[in-house]
Amino acid sequence: MFDFFRKKNNGNRDGGEGAPGAPRSGEGATADAGGKTTRDVLAEFTAAPLPDAVDGLLFRVSMADAANPASGFEAYAARLLSDAEAPSLRAIAVEHPVELRRLNTTNLFWSVFDDSTISAGARGTILRIESVLDRLAMISMIMEDDNGAVPASAFTEGQCSEADWRVLRSIANDAGRYLGAADRDNKLDTQYGTTGTRGGNWDLSTRFATACEEMVLPFRLEYRFICDSGTGTIVADVSMPAPDVFPKSRFDEAGGQWVDVSAQRTGAAAAYGLRLAALIASAAFGSSVGVTRVIVNGKEGSIAGATVMSLEFGRIPFTMGTMAAIRDGRFSAPETACDPATLFDMLHLQNSAFNLADDGSLQPVEPLEVELAVVRTPVAEDDRELSPELRDLLHADTVRELDVMSEQDAELGARYRAIMEEKDDSLLLAVAQLEDIVAETTKVTEEDEAVRALRESGVAVKPLYCENVFARYLVSLADSDPAVRYQRVSDIGQAARSSLSRIYRDMGDLDAAEAQARVCIELAPTSAPAYNDLITCFAEGEHYDRIIEVAKEALRIAVTGNDISYIFYRLAFAYWQTGRLREALACYLRVPEASPMGEAGLRERNDLIGEMGNDVPGNDWDPTACLRTAGVPLAPLDDVMEVVGRALVLLCDQNMPLAAAPLASLVASTQRNDILHAVAASLRQGV
């Protein structure tokens, strides 16, 4: 680990700021002996493990001398990385692997790590380093000035410092572009054949998230939002950088030395927060001319941090007042870099909760209260009626009928788990106990008074088990009659049936195992995992032709990545065992290495290729065409995703975000779309 300010040839920086003999870092650029461009310097951070790349740059700069000087760009990079405690990254990366990526959309950096296991301090260090690299990337853009790559020595270290502060105070300069976005096409408004209402919640959500994902910012932006077309309101929670990530020092051109600006970091953070709020407001107002009110809640450090500002913008004051200050340069003037009070007056706010302490730091505040038409009642408790369109599509009359995930009977669940823990002591006893659970839950289902009343009134009601939330939305694929309604059956009852199938299989009674497995499928026609017991039962009897047919049926309704990859894994082996090696290889190629069966799938695929020998297909072979010829459904199928897309857009537009959220997550994962992931997170979590 290297400390840039504690190595040789550091210009006597150990002697303090402006010590005698210290070089005037802002004077004249030195030639870059290595001929590196700023792009070359930045590329090194993704070309090697991040700790090595960071320490490598710090080492190079620390060893620079008159004969081999460091470029101004690299010297400033070393200064920022040292301030960000970058040398401590290696110890963090040992326990928590960190991967650095470069985003094609913004050309900025993104650190990938497991957010669920890392400490707040370690996370903060990683994000400080990420922000340093992002600021360097933005400084590089300033240096290039749209003229292509430039030498890393084109700016002195002092000039890089000034460019850095220019970056920090100019983030709202693109507000005009976002404000005028409502007239542009929204490529995400249509999902699998269903288009959201223009200016409706889905249109607003996808437009706003698109704008946020496009923002080129020096600090990571975390955000959640609610779009409410009914009241013309967008509420956004956004992360705002803490003071400790701002520069500690700044080059004083007049004095020819570096000066300590640590005391100004609180003001810089508050000023940045106000600029970010203005930029977010421009994106919100630019989502539709129907948006007349925007509330931005700033969260210190991360989206989970304390609220340190809550600002309400009105459309006309913003477009006529705030935007005027942004366009004429007052909002990004050098003298406002650390002056939040002046910026605050330029925002022309309708209401605010904003409290600066004597030291200039933002203090926690209560977010402004706002009434919205969007209702965030849990699905299991939501008695609102569905629209006729949704009723026919989802075979339900109220939102709560879509619930398949709430806990049903905790006591019965504990009883089931106890049986399974002790089943190896006596399989026959376990069978009897599980049969009791099946009988009890079946009786409860049959005696449900509400369902009985529906049937007596002439409504067809079918029992339904859903392995996951998506299965409930797909029931129209199982029954085309929109008048049919579904009754949620016991989750524990279904688990007992599945366990019975496995136990019967272990006991060698494959007929009984198959019978239970078929009942599981009958009760869960839209759940791909319900087919797994039958596939395993057939595998036990080596009926691989039958596995192929069952797997094809499962693929017709499979929607999640893990479900799809698991079925292809089982299908691949079945094809292999029936001698259809090319079909087997094509199936194995659809099992991602990162999936639960990825490692096993890769191992079996390699064994298969070894067995194929000279018959391994060449580069002109099309595995997708091979599967189509074999009649294998390439899940997720169009008719499945059309139902998903229709339900998603309608539920979102009709103010039912919690019912829409799982579908948004599914669509985002299927399309691998960060914008849709952001929409899904906001539908799920709100603000």
What are these regions (language model features)?
Residues 461-483, 542-549, 573-583, 608-634, ...:
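Alpha-helical linker/edge segments of TPR/alpha-solenoid repeat scaffolds
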Residues 411, 415, 497, 531, ...:
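TPR repeat positional signature
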Residues 525, 559-562, 596, 671:
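Short coil turns that delineate tetratricopeptide repeat
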Residues 422, 504, 538, 575, ...:
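Residue at a conserved register position within TPR or TPR-like alpha-solenoid repeats
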Residues 424, 507, 541, 578, ...:
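Structural motif corresponding to the intra-repeat A-B loop/turn of tetratricopeptide repeats
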Residues 400-405, 440-493, 520, 555-564:
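Flexible helix-coil transition and linker loops at the boundaries of alpha-helical arrays
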Residues 2-399, 564:
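Long, charge-dense low-complexity segments
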